[in-house]
Structure formats: structure tokens, C-alpha cells
């Protein structure tokens, strides 16, 4: 009898010990002296196919930082860098970013796990269509759940960092925030709470709404001029003479592109730079573009109207800036033959089937992996707005443009193909994930007011019932005046709106952490009482 009682009694002592440490204050009483970037790294043997374990395993890499960790039973702050090799995103382990800041607040350890098929976490030695079959949404989400449930963390061999014994908090931004939201929906009951910054939750193949927040937030005279430029480009490419079309391509340095849609796409690309602007930035490529167009001096945050400029001058200014500042070295890639010229346009050419972009199956080709994700289950293709809506993205770019590229990059190999070719659509994805219709539990969403990704988020103005309302179990914070994932970086705390959002979010996560220990102490006490009676 004693040996059966010993385990629950010791477990209760551990949890109550953690409670006594955590409940009075979630902040460490003394800031640890160890401020090194990393505490260590590990290798996890991950299943290639979670429905067929016999397929085998691969080495999934992870890193951890225990600078603020309070010991066994203390929280785990979980993060994945999504579509980036982990070695390029290890700063997310530190308190210069939100995961590290939360860890500091709740005395947690940060654990960063690399996404399958990126960086060093490769199931196969090449990225053929057949090998990419295991890069599917269910496999990706199952990776992180399986990791949390079964990993033996090197810094806690006691086993008390299991999700049943300690709260695992998943923090994500951008694509990884979408994974956060979809995990909460499809794989609940492993992670205790979630923080999703800039999560696109409603799948869209024709994502023209991406443009809207940019149009609302950018300097309005720059917006008007860009709308006029894109309208002119579309008119020339749709109804101009062959000479006029070629002249326009030459003006922008894009004469080597044979497909008009590729040229239109290239001329629309600088607009996407709006997404990257952070409140702490003092100079951005986007503001540089607007300044060049109007010979003005806009800051990255200014949104007022400027003076009107003659359209021909505006067009010439944009062409000069594009050709001399944006295009040079855009496509330069030394390891690809033909891509070494300063003004190469090879990365923009989607019809040159001899291009190495179509044949590079090496596991270092992150662009191919991301293309697969987009073609398989993620979508969110930026397109031109409907004809009755002003656009800053060419209307020549529609879902067909992207789907054609999917077919060329990922030829069918036997029965192996990508999601869209197999019948996956945005509608089927939303039926699976819930899209805009969701009722979450202990998940916090944040979105920037002028973030293009807001249009697919819970705060979207395009949501049929309007932006989703915040609840106690699913708090939603709209950060005024900022773009994408601004609350992920401590340097952005210079912005009042970002600072308040971060403080509110961290306080909410802290309360949920306390809830875990409170609820689990009651459950353990009840279970132990029942066990002793019997």
C-alpha cells in the first residue's frame, strides 16, 4: 500500500512546493546573474508520420533558455520560429522578445522547437514532391503536441515539466501564431494557454483584403499615387500595344521578364514592405519608396495627405526608385547560375522552366518549403482588389497566377501531389479549423490596426459579423497605429500602445499560469483524498 501512496504524495508535495513559490509572486526575487543567450540545445526523435509511426523518425532540433526558470514544475514558454531556420531566430529565447519576457515574469524556461523541413530538422535528404507529403498541417501540429507530451528536457529530468504537471504556454507570431490558433482548435488539452500575435485564422486563396490595412495606414498621398501607378500598369498590360508593354517593362528594368503577370507582380512587391515596419524603426524601405515617389519626406508612421504631384513625374519617380534601389541584388544568389547579376530578375520569372528555382531540391531551399506550405494548406495569396475597389496590388495577379506556379514547382510524382491539386480549398480549410468562427479557451489574440494580416484575423473588418469581441477565455487586443507582430519585440515598448498591449497580455498569461497551479492543486488534493479513503 505504501508504495502506491508514495507517488501521489510526493507529486502533491512537488506541486504544492511550486505553488508556494509561484503564488506569492510570479517574478523572481533576484534577477539571475546568468544572462547568456542560450542554456543549451537538444535533439528530439520526432515521428515522420504521426498516423503511421512505422515510417520512422527524424531529428527535430530544439533550444532552451533556463535563465529565469524556477525549477521543476515551473512554466514552459514554448515557441517555434515557423518558416525560419531556428538558428536565425534564437533571440526569441531571450527577454528582448515576448517569449523571454513572459518567462521572466512567470519564472519559466523558454523552449524553442524548429518546424519540420526547416533548418536542421529535415525528415529527408531532398525536397521532392514525394518527400514533401509529410509537410501537412496535421503532421506539423502533431509534432509540437508530441514533443510537449514526450520530450525529456535536459534541464529537468524529474519529469515535472510534463504538460500534466506544469503549464506549457505557446507564444507565436505571424505563421507560428496561426499554428497556435489551429492547435488550440484541433489539438486541445496539451498546452495550457496560448498567445497569438498577428494570427491569420480564416484561410483565403484570393486574399485581396491584404491590401486594405496598408491603404488605411500609409501616407494617403502616397496611397493615391500608388493606386494610380498600378492602375496605369494594369491598363497598359491589358490593353496597350506590344510596344507600350515593352516600353513599360524597360522603364522598370524588367525587360527580361516574358510574362506580363510576372512584371505586374514585381511592381506590386514593394507594397508588402509595409508589413515589416516596426514602431522602433527610424528608416524603412517603404517610407523610402513614398519619399522617392513624391520627392517628399514621410516618416514610416506618417499618414497625412501630402501635396499632389503630376502623374508622369510620379511614374518616373517610382520607376527610378524601383530600378536603382529596389531591384538591384533582389534576385542575386551566388549558388544559382544565372542569378549572379546585380540586376537579375530570375527570382521573378515563373515561366523559365530551366531556372534553378524549379529544380533545387536541396533541404536548404527554404523558399521551396514555404511554397509547398502555401500550395498545400496555407494559401493567403496576395492579389489585386476587385474592380470596384481601389488597389495597390496589380489585378493581373489572381489565384490562378499562384496555382500555375504550384503546378510548375511541384510536378506530380505517382499519386504524390500538393493540397490544392488534391482538392484542398480555403473553404475546406476553414471547415477544418473554424476560420473566423471560433470559441477559444485560454487563448489571447493581438493584432495591429494597420497589419495587412489583420484582414484574415479575428479582428478583421471583413469578418461577416464584424471584428470578434473579446471574452475572458479569448481576449482580443487591437493595437492602434501599428503593423505586424509589434508586441513581440521589447524594443517596440517605446510605443505606448504596444507597451500597454504587452503588459496586458503578460498579465493575462500570468493569471492563467496561476489558474493552472490552483486548479491542479485542488484536483490533486481531491484525488489523493479519494485514494486514501479507498
Swiss-Prot record:
Sequence intervals crossing the membrane: none
Signal sequence interval, chain numbering: 1-17
Highest taxon listed in the record's lineage: Eukaryota
Biological processes per GO annotation: proteolysis
Entry EC number(s): 3.4.-.-
Keyword Protease: yes
Active site: 174 (charge relay system), 451 (charge relay system)
Pfam families named in the record: Peptidase_S28
UniProt KW keywords: Glycoprotein, Hydrolase, Protease, Serine protease, Signal, Virulence
Pathway: Mycotoxin biosynthesis
Glycosylation sites: 34, 65, 126, 297, 335, 352, 415, 437
GO molecular function per UniProt: dipeptidyl-peptidase activity; serine-type exopeptidase activity
Entry's family note: Belongs to the peptidase S28 family.
Function: Serine protease, part of the gene cluster that mediates the biosynthesis of the secondary metabolite victorin, the molecular basis for Victoria blight of oats. Within the pathway, vicPa and vicPb are probably involved in the processing of the vicA1 and vicA2 precursors. The pathway starts with the processing of the precursor vicA1 by several endopeptidases including kexin proteases as well as the cluster-specific S28 family peptidases vicPa and vicPb to produce 7 identical copies of the hexapeptide Gly-Leu-Lys-Leu-Ala-Phe.
Name by which UniProt lists this protein: Serine protease vicPb
Species for this entry: Bipolaris victoriae (strain FI3)
Amino acid at each position: 500500500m505504501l508504495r502506491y501512496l508514495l507517488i501521489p504524495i510526493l507529486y502533491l508535495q512537488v506541486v504544492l512546493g511550486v505553488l508556494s513559490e509561484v503564488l506569492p509572486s510570479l517574478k523572481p526575487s533576484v534577477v539571475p546573474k546568468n544572462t547568456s543567450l542560450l542554456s543549451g540545445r537538444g535533439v528530439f526523435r520526432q515521428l515522420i508520420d504521426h498516423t503511421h509511426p512505422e515510417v520512422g523518425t527524424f531529428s527535430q532540433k530544439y533550444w532552451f533558455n533556463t535563465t529565469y526558470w524556477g525549477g521543476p514544475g515551473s512554466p514552459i514558454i514554448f515557441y517555434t520560429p515557423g518558416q525560419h531556420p531556428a538558428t536565425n531566430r534564437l533571440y526569441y529565447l531571450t527577454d528582448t522578445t515576448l517569449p523571454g519576457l513572459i518567462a521572466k515574469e512567470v519564472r519559466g524556461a523558454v523552449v524553442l522547437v524548429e518546424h519540420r523541413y526547416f533548418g536542421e530538422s529535415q525528415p529527408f535528404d531532398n525536397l521532392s514532391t514525394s518527400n514533401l507529403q509529410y509537410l501537412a498541417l496535421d503532421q506539423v501540429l502533431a509534432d509540437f503536441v508530441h514533443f510537449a507530451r514526450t520530450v525529456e528536457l535536459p534541464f529537468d529530468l524529474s519529469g515535472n515539466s510534463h504538460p500534466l504537471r506544469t503549464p506549457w504556454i505557446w507564444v507565436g507570431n505571424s505563421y507560428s501564431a496561426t499554428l497556435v490558433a489551429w492547435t488550440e482548435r484541433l489539438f486541445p488539452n496539451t498546452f495550457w494557454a496560448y498567445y497569438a500575435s498577428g494570427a491569420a485564422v480564416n484561410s483565403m486563396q484570393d486574399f485581396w483584403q491584404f491590401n486594405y490595412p496598408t491603404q488605411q495606414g500609409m501616407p494617403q498621398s502616397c496611397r493615391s499615387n500608388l493606386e494610380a501607378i498600378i492602375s496605369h500598369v494594369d491598363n497598359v498590360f491589358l490593353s496597350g500595344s506590344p510596344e507600350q508593354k515593352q516600353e513599360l517593362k524597360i522603364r522598370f528594368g524588367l525587360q527580361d521578364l516574358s510574362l506580363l503577370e510576372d512584371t505586374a507582380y514585381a511592381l506590386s512587391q514593394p507594397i508588402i514592405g509595409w508589413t515589416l515596419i516596426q514602431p522602433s524603426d527610424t528608416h524603412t524601405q517603404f517610407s523610402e519608396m513614398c519619399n522617392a515617389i513624391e520627392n517628399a519626406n514621410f516618416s514610416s508612421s506618417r499618414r497625412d495627405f501630402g501635396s499632389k504631384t503630376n502623374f508622369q513625374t510620379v511614374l518616373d519617380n517610382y520607376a527610378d526608385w524601383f530600378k536603382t534601389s529596389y531591384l538591384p541584388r533582389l534576385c542575386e544568389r551566388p549558388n544559382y547560375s544565372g542569378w549572379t547579376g546585380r540586376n537579375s530578375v530570375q527570382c521573378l520569372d515563373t515561366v523559365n522552366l530551366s531556372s534553378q528555382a524549379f529544380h533545387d531540391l536541396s533541404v536548404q531551399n527554404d523558399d521551396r518549403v514555404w511554397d509547398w506550405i502555401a500550395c498545400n494548406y496555407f494559401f493567403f495569396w496576395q492579389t489585386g482588389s476587385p474592380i470596384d475597389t481601389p488597389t495597390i496590388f496589380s489585378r493581373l495577379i489572381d489565384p490562378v497566377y499562384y496555382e500555375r506556379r504550384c503546378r510548375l514547382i511541384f510536378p506530380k510524382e505517382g499519386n504524390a501531389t500538393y493540397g490544392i491539386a488534391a482538392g484542398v480549398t480555403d473553404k475546406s480549410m476553414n471547415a477544418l479549423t473554424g476560420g473566423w468562427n471560433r470559441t477559444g479557451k485560454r487563448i489571447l489574440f493581438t493584432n495591429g490596426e494597420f497589419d495587412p494580416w489583420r484582414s484574415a484575423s479575428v479582428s478583421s473588418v471583413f469578418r461577416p459579423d464584424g471584428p470578434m469581441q473579446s471574452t475572458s477565455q479569448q481576449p482580443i487586443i487591437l493595437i492602434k497605429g501599428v503593423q505586424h507582430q509589434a508586441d513581440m519585440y521589447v524594443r517596440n515598448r517605446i510605443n505606448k500602445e504596444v507597451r500597454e498591449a504587452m503588459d496586458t497580455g503578460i498579465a493575462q498569461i500570468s493569471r492563467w499560469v496561476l489558474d493552472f497551479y490552483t486548479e491542479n492543486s485542488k484536483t490533486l488534493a481531491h484525488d489523493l483524498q479519494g485514494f486514501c479513503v479507498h
